[in-house]
UniProtKB/Swiss-Prot annotation:
Domain of life: Eukaryota
PANTHER family, sorted: FAMILY WITH SEQUENCE SIMILARITY 91 MEMBER A1, PROTEIN FAM91A1
Family designation: Belongs to the FAM91 family.
Signal peptide bounds: none
Protein name listed in UniProt: Putative uncharacterized protein encoded by LINC00869
Source organism: Homo sapiens (Human)
């Protein structure tokens, strides 16, 4: 799927569907490559675009398809989706036809309109074999920008040419890369956390988690999930046969609250928060 804001003055996205980008292909032949490139061809000359890479979760955010039926939880999720939608809008407006991004490459005898912007879904792009995908990106794009964080199940596109801004591997967006336990130890703050290595067989829930109603469970290569304490032991023993597992508390009496902070930060709010934490 390709969403393009490149042509004319219209701001409406134009969706192009192609079997070459939505299905897997193992062919290394030129016809397949030509079809792939043609599906992403540019309408005006050969001006390269900026590609914004996203995964299928972005569609769910914009459609609000994952809202909880519980009113209190649904309101928090709706606020989260709204903030992410605003961040996407601001990112799109900044990247699309931004003259400041092409100052060094602009020709003095040619008008500077900035680069057009395309939204590329990672699942479709990764359906191409690596060689074909690399040729498509090099032919059509001057810069790749990844949505962050991408879902852990999706391996994002990594590229040196064109330059890529964003997480190069899924582990960059994972709890393991962020090293939560180390940060909690240094700052002296954070929820009770326990990292269990693969193959561990706990016979009972550790005492530190006995008083909590729900726990946040994160295993390697998967997004975290909230599990009731009453049946977490069975799930833990099953997950530990495949990977290491990080256990964190998520609600002392009821459902815990997770705060999602969209980037970029608002400078005024950032200064207020810094003052608040510094004075507390």
């Amino acid at each position: 799927m390709l969403l393009s804001w490149g042509g004319g003055e219209s701001r409406r996205p134009v969706q192009e569907a192609s079997s070459a980008t939505d299905t897997d292909t193992n062919s290394q032949e030129d016809p397949a490559d030509t079809a792939s490139v043609r599906s992403l061809s540019l309408s005006a000359g050969h001006t390269k675009h900026i590609a914004f890479l996203f995964d299928s979760t972005l569609t769910a955010f914009l459609m609000m398809g994952n809202l909880s039926p519980v009113q209190s939880t649904g309101e928090r999720e709706a606020q989260r989706y709204f903030e992410h939608a605003l961040t996407l809008r601001n990112t799109t407006l900044f990247l699309r036809h931004n003259k400041d991004l092409v100052v060094q490459t602009a020709q003095p005898d040619q008008p500077n309109y900035g680069f057009p912007l395309d939204l590329l879904r990672c699942e479709s792009l990764l359906g191409l074999d690596p060689a074909t995908g690399s040729r498509v990106l090099n032919k059509n794009y001057t810069l790749l920008v990844s949505m962050a964080p991408l879902t852990n199940e999706i391996r994002p596109v990594s590229s040196c040419t064109p330059q890529h801004i964003g997480p190069a591997i899924p582990e960059v967006s994972s709890v393991w890369f962020k090293q939560y336990i180390y940060v909690y130890h240094i700052t002296g703050q954070g929820p009770p956390s326990l990292l269990l290595s693969k193959g561990t067989r706990p016979r009972k829930l550790p005492d530190i988690f006995q008083s909590y109603d729900r726990l946040l469970i994160t295993s390697w290569g998967h997004d975290p999930g909230v599990v009731p304490t009453s049946n977490v032991l069975t799930m833990l023993n099953d997950a530990l046969t495949h990977s290491a597992v990080l256990i964190q508390e998520h609600g002392l009496h009821g459902i815990g609250e997770t705060v999602h902070v969209p980037f970029p930060f608002d400078e005024t709010e950032l200064q207020e928060d810094s003052c608040q934490y510094g004075c507390s």
